[in-house]
Amino acid sequence: MQVTQLNLFPLKSAQAYSVQQVFVQAQGLSFDREFMITELDGTFVTARKDKILYQFSVLPIPQGIVLCYQQTQYVVRYVDFKQMQPCEVWGEVFLSYIADTQVNHWLSSIFQREVQLRWLGVESQRQLTAMAKPMSFADSNPILLCSQKSLHQIQQWAPVEVTMAQFRANIVIDGQTAFAEELWRVIQIGEVMFEFVQHCTRCVMITRDLQTHELNPHVEPFRTLKTHHTNARGKPIFGIHLIPQNSGIVRVGDRLQVIRSEEI
């Protein structure tokens, strides 16, 4: 088995930025979910509610990032983030940097309400108690791995076209058997050892059309997963969450080795 895709999501809930190699650190993949848009009170903005986020993409540059929206580009420098204020992701409150007024004014004009751009900073102030490690702006775990073999099985079940992009995986592998990854507990890819945290439970976000940005009227492929592939609590699952055990580089084409798995 080997890695076929590496995807970063520099801005939470926005478009993927695909790379051929990535540096893995304690908080996850470097440059993944290091930025997010929040309300004025620091509450995170998500594409579950604001589909406009799917129209944003981010390009890295040495001094910061380029925010791209439709035909507009806006250069945001790291030095533009000076003030730290509390922010919130799924009820967890921690400090992050706020972009300057000009950046936030531009974003607010797009969202048609006042919002802010946040940056984790060089060192994340967020730390999940269960992990005892720094964490990005990701929902609950730093890295998501999905298998193309598992996707193929979902495509066989679903009455609509389903793509890997809908599942927003960081690491995509070719796989050998559908859903075999759900039994892995420790794996190695390239220079990095990863430990299984939990299966990825899915929400209606996977039903959003990546071209029109509208939710599928038949709630697919969420409904298909709900019918065919759930955890013990009846929640649809696809992919596994991982935490890195060390730092190092992972590349497209790297071999995946299963170090330890759970017996059926």
Predicted regions and their residues:
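Metal-cofactor-dependent catalytic cores
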Residues: 1-264
